[in-house]
Amino acid sequence: MLIHPQINPVALQLGPLAIHWYGLTYLAAFGLFFFLATRRLRHEPYASITGPGAWSRKDIEDILFLGVMGVVIGGRLGYCLFYKPGYYLAHPLEILAVWQGGMSFHGGMLGVLASQFWFARTRQRPWLQVMDFVAPCVPTGLAAGRMGNFINGELWGRFSSPDLPWGMVFRNSGSMLPRHPSQVYQFLLEGLLLFVLLWLYARKPRKMGQVSGAFLVGYGVFRFIAEYFREPDDFLGILALGLSMGQWLCVPMIVGGAGLWWWASQRAASAPAARA
């Protein structure tokens, strides 16, 4: 049995300015996205697209800026609407109190979809072409976010067997019984494993929309599995059919992603072969 080390959430204190580990993980997520996206510029079909203009670093900068806005706004609104709609409808000004915590991946994803739709429209590019470009660069950012959750000692797992070698006591949970370190599970599943699978998948010739569909299915399945080990939100608990809110939100992702992949697979033309 392990004990969570209760790491100081403040990584660096500069006078009145406190730099939190969680903020650094967001910074790492955006930095990793930029690095991987510049690599994607070398892959087909993006390396050979000329109309309405060649893909460039400026495109990546704009995608990242709009994506950050989508993550923050969508993540916050998603949390308020998916998890505590009654409370925030009664206290709408507290939606702006982001420093109190409360972000939703599913809301952030919707925010990113909307922001990239705007980017695609303004650059006259197919939306799915943009999303296929973005999708393989996302999982490393998710991994960074889960490490932030672990450092903060939040979003811990359900109780585990006392014999589980990596069972961990999270003192912030108010219990000294071992739990699953579900943040680590999500780091490995939604972060590292999804990244490896999707990056390799995206480097081969794919029809437009298949990479996006694969991301939706992959994330949805891995998150659905991880939720069995994650402690449900205490104000929601377990919902219908014994599933958590996170699992229910994954269902349309999996179904929609599978439908998108199938629809894309019916298209006649595939992208040219990718290169390293």
Swiss-Prot record:
E.C. number(s) listed in UniProt: 2.5.1.145
An example Gene Ontology biological process: lipoprotein biosynthetic process
Pfam families: LGT (PF01790)
Enzyme class: transferase
Record-level GO cellular component terms: plasma membrane
Primary residence: membrane
Pathway connected to this protein: Protein modification; lipoprotein biosynthesis (diacylglyceryl transfer)
Residue ranges crossing the lipid bilayer per the database entry: 17-37, 63-83, 95-115, 182-202, 209-229, 235-255
Keyword line: Cell inner membrane, Cell membrane, Membrane, Transferase, Transmembrane, Transmembrane helix
Positions bound to a 1,2-diacyl-sn-glycero-3-phospho-(1'-sn-glycerol): 146
UniProt xrefs under HAMAP family: Lgt (MF_01147)
NCBIfam families referenced in this protein's UniProt entry, alphabetically: lgt
Job of this protein: Catalyzes the transfer of the diacylglyceryl group from phosphatidylglycerol to the sulfhydryl group of the N-terminal cysteine of a prolipoprotein, the first step in the formation of mature lipoproteins.
Assigned protein family: Belongs to the Lgt family.
Protein name in the entry: Phosphatidylglycerol--prolipoprotein diacylglyceryl transferase
Organism: Polaromonas sp. (strain JS666 / ATCC BAA-500)
